Amino acid sequence: MDNGMLSRFIMTKTLLVFCISMTLSSHFGFSQMPTSSVQDETNDNITIFTRILDGLLDGYDNRLRPGLGERITQVRTDIYVTSFGPVSDTEMEYTIDVFFRQSWKDERLRFKGPMQRLPLNNLLASKIWTPDTFFHNGKKSIAHNMTTPNKLLRLEDDGTLLYTMRLTISAECPMQLEDFPMDAHACPLKFGSYAYPNSEVVYVWTNGSTKSVVVAEDGSRLNQYHLMGQTVGTENISTSTGEYTIMTAHFHLKRKIGYFVIQTYLPCIMTVILSQVSFWLNRESVPARTVFGVTTVLTMTTLSISARNSLPKVAYATAMDWFIAVCYAFVFSALIEFATVNYFTKRGWAWDGKKALEAAKIKKKERELILNKSTNAFTTGKLTHPPNIPKEQLPGGTGNAVGTASIRASEEKTSESKKTYNSISKIDKMSRIVFPILFGTFNLVYWATYLNREPVIKGATSPK
């Protein structure tokens, strides 16, 4: 009995210990299994990706393009513009900051793994084949490297690569300035392969002609232009090394006229109006009218020089040049008009003065003759007149004295009236009407012509 009881006791204790251990293991051991499995899975993925990357570059030659000898490599491109501007008129160039995306397929980089898309470090871009894209009209291009190279590289399991770079490009923008400052321009951005002709590499737009070039809503950095929109297309050029495809994106710009109205147009208009004030001054006011004429001519000269400083030295006249030239003609004509009036005014003074001098001499002789006769008659009458005849009836009496006084008064009045030799010039009268009408008509025709017509954008090509 004792042995049986001892055996049962031992078995019971053993069973109890087993149950307790199972309970503890279920509480602690099973709770640690998920973490351990996640870590193991992560480690396995890292190991798998490492093996994939190591295997991708085994026997890979980045000197050879994908599909060499079998097919043409197609490179799909699109552009996202983060900042557009500024635009330099004098240099005929513009600056643009973009995310430049390129996508192509390289069957040598196909892989099988737990993920369909594999994000890669930008260092791998130097170890694989990438398109030799360059910008045809680029003057200066910068690839951003702060804080690390701004590049993105993604690889899909079928070998499709997405390569994105952030670039700042200064590109040429040919401008036709005949309509300046009411002009519009299409600034192109042209890029393509440097070495591969169409028989080896072709470029296409990723999202067609409408969405392949997108400008951010707050991406415009323009003070003198409105960014009206953008269009894309393709061009083909033939050289001695083959035929190449050029991808083109045109950014359509319309100039803002407000700055030039304040800076040039209003001062020119006010100067012309000021020059016409001289028509209302007396033609005898030679200093005042001379100051008006010379000052306005010098002002127009200064305005014409300053207006040209913001433009390149083109060989043709712009719309602003025509306006300034006409205003200059009006101002100079006002000065010539004054010179003409002044010339005839001097001649009028000379002839009127000569006639007045001759008339004064004749009147003086007549007056002396009359006075002599009156004095002699008065003296004779005083000595010999009959006593019954009043003095008023005698020749040379008081009546004659009154007549002589009236003659003198009329002569003085005549001489006073002769002092004003010149009336208002007929040329001035005509100029007061003709000059404002002509200048107003010119402004009406000028602004109606340039503001109401559609802007002519030269250099833009229709999308293909």
Swiss-Prot record:
Gene3D superfamilies noted in UniProt: Neurotransmitter-gated ion-channel ligand-binding domain, Neurotransmitter-gated ion-channel transmembrane domain
Subunit structure, as described in the record: Heteropentamer, formed by a combination of alpha (GABRA1-6), beta (GABRB1-3), gamma (GABRG1-3), delta (GABRD), epsilon (GABRE), rho (GABRR1-3), pi (GABRP) and theta (GABRQ) chains, each subunit exhibiting distinct physiological and pharmacological properties.
Catalytic reactions on record: chloride(in) = chloride(out)
Subcellular location: Postsynaptic cell membrane; Cell membrane
Species this chain originates from: Rattus norvegicus (Rat)
Keyword list, A-Z: Cell membrane, Chloride, Chloride channel, Disulfide bond, Glycoprotein, Ion channel, Ion transport, Isopeptide bond, Ligand-gated ion channel, Membrane, Postsynaptic cell membrane, Receptor, Signal, Synapse, Transmembrane, Transmembrane helix, Transport, Ubl conjugation
Predominant place of localization: membrane
GO CC, one annotated term: GABA-ergic synapse
Keyword Zinc: no
SUPFAM superfamilies, alphabetized: Neurotransmitter-gated ion-channel transmembrane pore, Nicotinic receptor ligand binding domain-like
Glycosylated residues in this chain: N45, N145, N207, N236
A molecular-function term among this protein's GO annotations: GABA-gated chloride ion channel activity
Protein name (database record): Gamma-aminobutyric acid receptor subunit alpha-5
Tissue spec. comment: Expressed in brain areas such as cerebral cortex, hippocampal formation and olfactory bulb granular layer.
